[in-house]
């Protein structure tokens, strides 16, 4: 995957991002599998950015420099440089589709929406190259209802437990990475047939590690689906009954960018 770097100023921005608390897109056409909620507890599904995080090619992708301190300047600020596709991030459709939407053109109602979580952690524990299949999705729908258009679909593999150790997370052996993902058929079913807004996963890519052609990317991005990669905490989510909020950096004409991701869960869960 190509390395795309952005540089941003973080001087005196402060820590308070605006809360997207109650706007839920597509509520009126939800099914039991994708029933949104508008209040409850909020769970963070993203990693904090740091210089030691795993990277696709093993090379540094994030750096920062302090430019102001409270002792010297009366306020604290930094500059930082990062790749678009680093840490918990969004792949906009334009990343693999020539006419796809760039990250700044992702519609807000596709970033805040009812979600489902398909858990394949048991399969991934047995097979590090396991891929979510069409049959897995159909079994999920048989149990929880059909996935409706606009849904954010998260795939929980448990791979994020390896995040603190970049070598184990990227899991490269004999020149090939090994981690779970989706088959191209499963990605196409979600993006083309179910018309989901997004596919998210707790690994470095929705394609499994050994992929060299990124078949799942090519099967889903021309259909308008964006991806969330390097998420965390997905195995703790329920299959249905929650909302996801995705807030990527809004880079003009960008192919993606680091993102905050939150799940809004009912208080009882």
Language-model features: locations:
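Bacterial N-terminal signal peptides
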Residues: 11-23
């Amino acid at each position: 995957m190509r390395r795309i770097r952005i540089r941003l100023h973080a001087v005196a921005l402060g820590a308070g991002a605006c809360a997207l608390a109650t706007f839920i897109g597509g509520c009126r056409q939800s099914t039991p599998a994708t029933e949104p909620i508008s209040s409850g507890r909020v769970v963070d599904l993203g990693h904090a950015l740091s210089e030691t995080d795993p990277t696709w090619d093993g090379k540094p992708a994030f750096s920062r420099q302090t430019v102001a301190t409270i002792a010297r300047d009366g306020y604290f600020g930094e500059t930082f440089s990062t790749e678009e596709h680093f840490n918990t991030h969004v792949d906009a459709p334009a990343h693999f589709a020539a006419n796809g939407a760039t990250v700044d053109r992702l519609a807000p109602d596709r970033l805040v929406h009812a979600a489902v979580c398909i858990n394949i952690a048991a399969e991934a524990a047995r097979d590090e190259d396991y891929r979510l299949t069409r049959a897995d999705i159909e079994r999920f729908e048989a149990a929880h209802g059909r996935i409706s258009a606009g849904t954010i679909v998260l795939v929980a593999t448990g791979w994020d437990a390896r995040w603190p150790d970049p070598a184990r997370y990227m899991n490269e052996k004999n020149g090939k990475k090994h981690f779970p993902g989706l088959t191209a058929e499963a990605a196409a079913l979600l993006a083309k047939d179910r018309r989901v807004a997004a596919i998210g996963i707790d690994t470095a890519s929705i394609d499994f590690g050994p992929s060299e052609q990124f078949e799942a990317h090519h099967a889903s991005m021309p259909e308008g689906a964006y991806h969330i990669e390097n998420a965390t905490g997905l195995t703790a989510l329920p299959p249905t009954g929650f909302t996801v909020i995705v807030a990527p950096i809004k880079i003009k004409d960008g192919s993606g960018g680091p993102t905050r991701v939150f799940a809004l869960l009912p208080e009882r869960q």
